[in-house]
Amino acid sequence: MKNVFKALTVLLTLFSLTGCGLKGPLYFPPADKNAPPPTKPVETQTQSTVPDKNDRATGDGPSQVNY
């Protein structure tokens, strides 16, 4: 039984260590100081207060219409 726990401990340790550093460094490299700033303009989106479609029925109750 002790051999099983030792083997599982070794396998778990090796398995957890294999993931270390596989995707490169674990930090972000410093930004390039000569890189130009982004040139894409920021577009502001405004939301209308009037709905595009009226989803009410002919009376005051809501409709079950799927557009």
UniProtKB/Swiss-Prot annotation:
Signal peptide positions (record): 1-19
Composition bias type Polar residues, residue spans: 42-51
Knockout-associated phenotype: Inactivation of the gene impairs LptD oxidative maturation and causes the accumulation of intermediate oxidation forms. It prolongs the residence of LptD and LptE at the BAM complex.
GO BP terms, alphabetized: Gram-negative-bacterium-type cell outer membrane assembly
Keywords associated with the record: Cell outer membrane, Lipoprotein, Membrane, Palmitate, Signal
Protein's membrane topology: Lipid-anchor
PROSITE patterns: PROKAR_LIPOPROTEIN (PS51257)
Compartments where found: Cell outer membrane
Region listing for Disordered, in residue ranges: 26-67
Coiled coil: none
Lipidation (S-diacylglycerol cysteine): 20
One GO cellular component term noted in the UniProt record for this chain: cell outer membrane
Main location: membrane
InterPro entries, sorted: LptM_cons (IPR032831)
Lipid-modified residues, N-palmitoyl cysteine kind: 20
Family the entry assigns: Belongs to the LptM family.
Function: Component of the lipopolysaccharide (LPS) transport (Lpt) pathway that promotes efficient assembly of the outer membrane LPS translocon (LptDE) by the BAM complex. Facilitates oxidative maturation of LptD by stabilizing a conformation of the LPS translocon in which LptD can efficiently acquire native disulfide bonds, thereby activating the LPS translocon. Might stabilize an active conformation of the LPS translocon by mimicking its natural substrate.
Subunit record text: Interacts with the outer membrane embedded portion of the LPS translocon formed by LptD and LptE (LptDE). LptM binds to sites in both LptD and LptE, forming a 1:1:1 heterotrimeric complex.
Protein name: LPS-assembly lipoprotein LptM
Source species: Escherichia coli (strain K12)
